[in-house]
A protein has these predicted regions:
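Transmembrane-helix motifs of polytopic, lipid-linked glycan transferases
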Residues: 14, 99-124, 157, 309-314
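Transmembrane alpha-helical segments
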Residues: 19-24, 385-390, 400-426
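Transmembrane-lumen/periplasm boundary regions of multi-pass, lipid-linked membrane glycan transferases
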Residues: 40-46, 197-306
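Loop-to-helix entry region of an early transmembrane alpha helix in multi-pass inner-membrane enzymes
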Residues: 77-84, 89-107, 141, 293-302
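Short acidic/glycine- and proline-prone juxtamembrane loop motifs at membrane-interface regions
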Residues: 137-150, 191
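Membrane-interface alpha helices of multi-pass inner-membrane proteins
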Residues: 174-191, 224-228
């Protein structure tokens, strides 16, 4: 690799890291709580208040209710253990906990990238830093604190453990023992792991039996450790008559949707490496960017061409076993050529298994989030393709590197624009959190009454812990929340217009309401007597008046 290319790659790497870190923290600031996010937050805060970590994780099906004691849940305490730990570390401040969460994601990403450098070289490091660190799916995972998206970060660790196990070196025994435990932890965040990557690993070990038997004892140790990770769940289930487990079985029996209607979005394997989020379909992209900037459509199209080409080239080379270029693995830019090939073999093995298993086991095919466990491994097709271009198509390789520079700026801009309306909701939620949190701290344990629209009573119930939420009719303090109608964030009061799915036009905690838990729209602000009250706090959208009642 020449010195000029080295310098260019270092610049690309530096810019990718800077943009990734800045964007991750910037986007999380105003990330919004959706319906299932609020459910997860409520369940977490209940565990935080009682100092008891739930033995189950997130709800398998969004129920539409914030409180639902009969919801079917993911087995295992991993999700809420992590959630509560970060919340406790932040001393019960939701937005501080989100900063810790983003930091943890980035630390794991950087560990993965450092490992990439030592195993595959500078070119691989720079390319993956650009593709993964500045990636819409990664940004979504990082900013959605209350969803079980840490499977994305665990996918980085799984690739490291799996690759080190394959290297057959001094510490391969240790990594062999860690393979199943890391998947068990993933499974406590998202149960779809057991319909995809877990059976893929088992079948892979069978296919590579001659190698697997060498580490059988350590693999078995890993299975035993995985069992221990689920032991608390099993103990509670035995005590309550396998309540949650039976609900899971019944849910599976009741799920009668034809498989062709719930076919797994296995295309996520390719989409992960592209410019866009899978949930923003082509029509949305064309409608949005087609008017604003046709150039962006071209950039997005190029990202899909690169992703598809990487997939095809890798498939030909790994599955059809045809060397596109006899020197493709001969140079030092991609060291560990056998390791790269084996990782890609696992990648392609996953695809049919992730399709067949939900069909056979009557599982839900699910969306792209069901394949987060393979997020990190999805990018190894890009590495092989980049190596192919470097040797076979040097001019295209130069264009590829130029596109990387465009990519890292365009992706962050694209994510910002696509999520602009949602960020307005998130900002309103953050200001709502700020105002009720300030009231709870100001009351300092004294009973109080809140005069406002009912949405704030709901926010206080959701966000304040037991010590802070001392709302009572027998109160010593009264608070009035006023809304700044001149603020650019203020549009309409909460009414049926929110059902038009224009969330930026209404102050809501999430951008759609379920009739089951929609707060009333009653406004008690007019009942507050401003005499002898003082303005104690304001933010961009709200203000708080306080009045202490005479004893």
């Amino acid at each position: 690799m020449n010195k000029n290319l080295n310098k260019i790659l270092i610049v690309l790497l530096s810019l990718s890291i800077i943009i990734s870190v800045f964007s991750s923290f910037y986007f999380q600031k105003d990330a919004f709580l959706s319906n299932d996010n609020e459910q997860h937050f409520y369940d977490m805060r209940r565990g935080y208040d009682t100092k008891i970590i739930p033995h189950t994780g997130a709800r398998l099906v969004t129920s539409g209710k914030i409180i639902d004691e009969n919801a079917v849940r993911v087995p295992g305490a991993g999700f809420y253990a992590r959630f509560i730990s970060l919340y406790s570390l932040s001393n019960g401040n939701y937005y501080t906990a989100r900063i810790f969460d983003v930091s943890l994601y980035l630390i794991i990403l950087f560990i993965f990238l450092i490992w990439i450098y030592f195993r595959f070289g500078l070119m691989a490091l720079s390319i993956l830093a650009a593709f993964i660190g500045v990636n819409c799916v990664f940004f979504e995972a990082v900013t959605s604190f209350t969803n079980p998206n840490p499977v994305v970060s665990f996918s980085f660790l799984f690739v490291i453990f799996f690759a080190e196990y394959l290297r057959d070196c001094k510490y391969s025994k240790v990594f062999a023992a860690l393979l199943f435990p890391i998947l068990a932890i993933m499974g406590q965040f998202h149960f779809a792991v057991y319909y995809g990557i877990v059976p893929t690993l088992i079948i892979y070990l069978i296919i590579r039996f001659n190698y697997s038997k060498k580490y059988f004892a350590y693999l078995f140790l890993g299975v035993f450790i995985s069992f221990l990770l689920y032991l608390p769940y099993l103990i509670v289930e035995i005590q309550n008559g396998f309540e949650n487990s039976l609900r899971m079985i019944n849910l599976s029996k009741e799920y009668t949707v034809p498989f062709y209607k719930r076919f797994p979005q296995i295309s996520a394997q390719i989409v992960f490496t592209t410019f866009t989020l899978n949930k923003f379909d082509v029509k949305t992209i064309l409608n949005f960017w087609g008017i604003v900037s046709p150039l962006m459509i071209i950039i997005i199209a190029v990202s899909y061409i690169i992703a598809a080409s990487s997939f095809i080239v890798s498939f030909i080379c790994i599955i059809l076993k045809k060397d596109i270029n006899k020197d493709i693995f001969k140079e030092v830019k991609f060291k560990n050529d056998k390791l790269l090939k084996e990782l890609l073999f696992f990648y392609f093995l996953y695809i049919p298994i992730a399709i067949i298993c939900p069909m056979v086991l009557k599982g839900k095919g699910g969306g792209y989030v069901y394949h987060f466990s393979m997020f990190a491994m999805s990018f190894f097709t890009i590495l092989l393709f980049a190596n192919y271009l470097y040797y076979k198509k040097p001019k295209l390789f130069n264009y590829f590197i130029i596109f990387m520079f465009i990519h890292i700026f365009a992706v962050s801009w694209h994510y910002y624009k696509q999520n602009y309306k949602f960020s307005l909701i998130g900002k309103k939620q953050r200001l709502t959190y700020d105002i009720v949190k300030h009231i709870g701290l100001n009351a300092n344990g004294e009973s109080f009454k809140l005069y406002s629209r009912d949405i704030f009573d709901y926010a206080a119930w959701l966000f304040l812990n037991e010590k802070e939420n001392t709302i009572s009719e027998n109160h010593n303090i009264e608070y009035l929340i006023i809304e700044n109608t001149n603020s650019v964030l203020y549009r309409f009061n909460d009414d049926d217009r929110i059902k038009e799915r224009e969330p930026h036009k209404a102050l809501t905690l999430y951008y759609w309401y379920s009739p089951v838990n929609k707060p009333n729209t009653k406004d008690t602000s007019g009942d507050f007597d401003l005499n002898n009250s003082i303005l104690i706090y304001t933010n961009e959208l709200f203000g708080v008046y306080k009045k202490e009642l005479k004893q």
